[in-house]
Amino acid sequence: MEKFTIYTGTTVPLMNDNIDTDQILPKQFLKLIDKKGFGKYLMYAWRYLDNQYTEDPDFVFNRPEYRKATILITGDNFGAGSSREHAAWALADYGFKVVIAGSFGDIHYNNELNNGMLPIVQPLEVRQALANLKPTDQVTVDLEQQKIFSPVGEFSFDIDGEWKHKLLNGLDDIGITLQYEDLITEYEKNRPSYWQ
């Protein structure tokens, strides 16, 4: 996993509440098994007018000024619903590095973290201020300081210490285990012969 320390990007507002994982990535696209390629299907029912991928010009992701945004500002209960990790894959493949919401579905929150994204919980007034930024305004997220720096202010956020450590060091679960490789090897050497 890529390290996440300080990230600067532009925002796109999608202030709907209760965006569930089926809206993020509909079930018909769950057959793909590689993490790459899901970005095309992100918010499929909202982004496209038909199954020929004719873009809906009124949907915010399709507006030229927001196409390169990498920080999503959204409503409460983002990622509710099923546990499909594919929804996080779609967000990451589309290019999102940070999602700022009022709250997250528990499993989806962890799926975003496991895929190197930073989900941040902020109150409505902060999200509204960020949602009203100009499309060219830069926002910086500093994980070490746990702060968001923007033209409309500086905001603190919370994150579990273990997740913070994993993101700052680019460690997934396997990477964490490999930190203890010497101890594991030593333990295996000292096991009774019938276990080896």
UniProtKB/Swiss-Prot annotation:
One of its GO terms (cellular component) is 3-isopropylmalate dehydratase complex. Its EC number is 4.2.1.33. Keywords: Amino-acid biosynthesis, Branched-chain amino acid biosynthesis, Leucine biosynthesis, Lyase. The keyword Ubl conjugation does not apply. The keyword Amino-acid biosynthesis applies. GO terms for biological process: L-leucine biosynthetic process. It holds the Pfam family Aconitase_C. GO terms for molecular function: 3-isopropylmalate dehydratase activity. It catalyses: (2R,3S)-3-isopropylmalate = (2S)-2-isopropylmalate. Pathway: Amino-acid biosynthesis; L-leucine biosynthesis; L-leucine from 3-methyl-2-oxobutanoate: step 2/4. It comes from the Bacteria. Heterodimer of LeuC and LeuD. Belongs to the LeuD family. LeuD type 1 subfamily. HAMAP family: LeuD_type1. Catalyzes the isomerization between 2-isopropylmalate and 3-isopropylmalate, via the formation of 2-isopropylmaleate. This is 3-isopropylmalate dehydratase small subunit. It comes from Streptococcus sanguinis (strain SK36). The lineage of its organism: Bacteria, Bacillati, Bacillota, Bacilli, Lactobacillales.
